[in-house]
Curated annotation (Swiss-Prot):
The UniProt record lists the keyword Iron-sulfur: no
Keyword Acyltransferase assigned: yes
Organism: Lactiplantibacillus plantarum (strain ATCC BAA-793 / NCIMB 8826 / WCFS1)
Function according to Swiss-Prot or TrEMBL: Catalyzes the transfer of an acetyl group from acetyl-CoA to tetrahydrodipicolinate.
Lineage, uppermost ranks: Bacteria, Bacillati, Bacillota, Bacilli, Lactobacillales
Protein name in the entry: 2,3,4,5-tetrahydropyridine-2,6-dicarboxylate N-acetyltransferase
A single GO BP: diaminopimelate biosynthetic process
Xref: CDD domains: LbH_THP_succinylT
Pathway participation: Amino-acid biosynthesis; L-lysine biosynthesis via DAP pathway; LL-2,6-diaminopimelate from (S)-tetrahydrodipicolinate (acetylase route): step 1/3
MF (Gene Ontology): tetrahydrodipicolinate N-acetyltransferase activity
Catalytic activity: (S)-2,3,4,5-tetrahydrodipicolinate + acetyl-CoA + H2O = L-2-acetamido-6-oxoheptanedioate + CoA
InterPro entries tied to this protein: DapH, DapH_N, Hexapep, Hexapep_transf_CS, Trans_hexapeptide_repeat, Trimer_LpxA-like_sf
Length: 236
């Protein structure tokens, strides 16, 4: 998968065919239905389920109303431009409930925990963990062997296309419920304390915290021991 810059993402979304995917449970004289090519069906006897775009399914249901006794419809998107990613493409641990859009790069042995949200164009390096409920906005970049804490937000930048994305270098640890604003660069080996609001670049091998975040100290042996990442959690 190729890396996308802002203009590529804008072009992708702008030109994509917008879809409203639906799943419909149907009951009736299903053998009498004339199903168009754009709808996939799984029928058995007088009951079954079908999948398709609402633009195709709605007229189909109306045209076949006489042969449909009842139906129940499920729908979780409207005019969506970006599908969900095919998770099978990644050599990573991705837990149930993670929301990952198409066109996201995820390195080997990365870990994406429950409830994490990863938007289009984001990049996650090898061995990095995105903890529960963390949000990576569009084009956010996370290097190798990082830990992005639960509830943390790495702000996304798709528009304007000239804006710089958030960049987190290798070996960075960010505590829970922190926020890193657009264009901020967090240097290699840095630690961002829980709850920090990071509005400016962070130097490598430093600890920052507070609102707004300020340098607290340089990384020392005590800090390293408290922020050690465990390779066993990244085993597949």
């Amino acid at each position: 998968m190729a890396k996308l810059d802002a203009q590529s993402i804008i072009n992708y979304i702008g030109s994509a065919k917008k879809k409203t995917p639906v799943k419909v449970y149907v009951k009736g004289a299903l053998d009498q239905l004339n199903v168009p090519a754009g709808i996939k069906t799984f029928f058995s006897g007088n009951a079954g389920v079908l999948f398709g775009d609402w633009a195709d399914v709605e007229p189909f249901l109306k045209a076949n109303a006489a042969n449909i006794e009842d139906y129940e419809l499920e729908n979780d998107a409207r005019n969506s431009a970006v599908p969900m990613a095919d998770l099978k493409q990644y050599n990573a641990r991705i837990e149930p409930g993670a929301i990952i859009r198409d066109q996201v790069l995820i390195g080997d042995n990365a870990v994406i925990m429950m409830g994490a949200v990863i938007n289009i164009g984001a990049e996650i390096g090898e061995g990095s963990m995105i903890d529960m409920g963390a949000i990576l906005g569009g084009r956010a970049i996370v290097g190798k062997n990082c830990h992005i804490g639960a509830g943390t937000v790495l702000a996304g930048v798709v528009e304007p296309p000239s804006a710089k994305p958030v960049q987190i270098d290798d070996d960075v640890l960010i505590g829970a419920n922190a926020a890193v604003l657009e264009g901020v660069h967090v240097g290699k080996g840095a630690v961002v304390a829980a709850g920090a609001i990071v509005i400016e670049d962070v130097a490598p091998n430093t600890v920052v915290g507070g609102v707004p975040a300020r340098k607290l100290k340089d990384i020392d042996d005590k800090t390293k021991s408290k922020t050690e990442l465990m390779a066993e959690l990244r085993n597949l």
